[in-house]
């Protein structure tokens, strides 16, 4: 059987927001079970407190000033390889689900699978947005720190 890697990364989650780190009020049984069966880090460091650059470092192993993604909405350099590309170069299929944020577009991404990842298992936020109903799409697009979100009429 081929070895498999499953890498889960939550977005904007402090340590005290997950039960496995000791907060009895946070009910996160699935994350707690994964932490029990996998690797749970006690200390963390981010090279950049902004989503895109932080993700670029995690997925490339290089600092943002080296890979070109020094802020959100700026793509990494074309010659920069992600872990998915490196793994696929070695015969390991790679899929991705979630907020990509490495293509230089807006929050939702382009919906296009980058080189080295399996397009059958590629689902970024743009793909998610395209599946939403118009009410939910409007709510998601309008939710920001600057504007008020409206609840869908079906809620």
Give short role names for the model-derived ranges.
Residues 135-137, 141-155:
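Single conserved hydrophobic/aromatic residue that forms the stacking wall/gate
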Residues 1-140:
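Formylglycine-dependent sulfatase
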